[in-house]
């Protein structure tokens, strides 16, 4: 193949007339961007010479690192362990390893999960709502100092739940809820239920479900209100507009008796 990996997570194509097309390692003295189909650019490598890894190791010993890493293979749906040697950030050698580090395997499965290769059955709507509620209150009430559920936090929770596993089918049936619950102390979960509840009481009726936004703010940085889907005639029972988190008004999504949207009401 003419495709080559470059440093800084870049890639390029070796010139077709190059005589080092079969070399595992090479150095190109000319790198340029050219126009390609579809108004795209292409990185072309010219004037390339084959090199050996031992030369690089002798010249730049301090820039060579070797790490044991785990990667998820979507084919067999399992974790593979490798010993990877890098020159700075560029991978120059990879060897299979029989021994798998439990924490590294859990992290690799967690990354695969976030890339939608599989989904744990226990990662249900309750967890998704916890994430939305927590992220919303982090923006609505930063003074309460809740720890947000950003991507890194979700990754850590999944990695802990998958620790020691090597197969996707193991991760699919794993119970991830305890790991997510440990994201913050139990007292803070109780505060979350108080300030950003799942439901809100309704006069002479069952509690109604609150809908938290996927993103707590809009493109201008303004906090997006929490929504309540309610039929218009049900609002006549209220004597005041509901609020949560002490001062944030709940936005009503008003519906007809047949659940067709009428309008929003703040």
Model-derived features with residue positions:
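Acidic, serine/threonine- and proline-rich low-complexity intrinsically disordered segments
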Residues: 1-3, 8, 24-199, 242-266
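Segments forming glycine/polar-rich beta-alpha architectures that bind adenosine-containing cofactors
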Residues: 1-36, 194-195, 207-231
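A structural detector for beta-sheet-dominated domains
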Residues: 73, 203, 213, 229-231, ...
């Amino acid at each position: 193949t003419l495709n080559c990996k470059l440093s800084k997570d870049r890639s390029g194509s070796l010139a077709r007339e190059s005589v080092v097309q079969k070399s595992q390692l090479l150095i190109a003295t000319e790198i340029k961007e050219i126009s390609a189909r579809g108004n795209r650019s292409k990185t072309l490598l010219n004037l390339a010479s084959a090199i050996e890894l031992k030369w690089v190791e002798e010249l730049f010993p301090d820039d060579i690192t070797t790490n044991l890493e785990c990667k998820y293979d979507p084919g067999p749906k399992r974790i593979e362990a490798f010993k990877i040697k890098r020159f700075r950030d560029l991978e120059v050698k990879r060897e299979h390893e029989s021994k798998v580090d439990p924490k590294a395997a859990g992290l690799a499965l967690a990354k695969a999960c976030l890339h939608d290769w599989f989904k744990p059955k226990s990662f249900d709507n309750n967890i998704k709502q916890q994430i939305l509620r927590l992220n919303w209150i982090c923006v609505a009430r930063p003074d309460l100092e809740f720890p947000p559920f950003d991507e890194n936090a979700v990754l850590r929770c999944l990695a802990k739940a998958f620790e020691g596993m090597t197969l996707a089918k193991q991760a699919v049936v794993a119970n991830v809820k305890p790991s997510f619950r440990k994201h913050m102390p139990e007292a803070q979960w109780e505060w979350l239920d108080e300030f950003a509840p799942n439901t809100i009481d309704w006069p002479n009726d069952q509690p109604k479900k609150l809908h938290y936004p996927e993103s707590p703010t809009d493109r201008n940085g303004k906090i997006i209100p929490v929504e309540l889907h309610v039929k218009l005639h049900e609002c006549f029972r209220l004597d005041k507009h509901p609020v949560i988190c002490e001062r944030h008004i709940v936005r009503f999504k008003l519906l007809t008796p047949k659940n067709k949207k009428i309008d929003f009401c703040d």
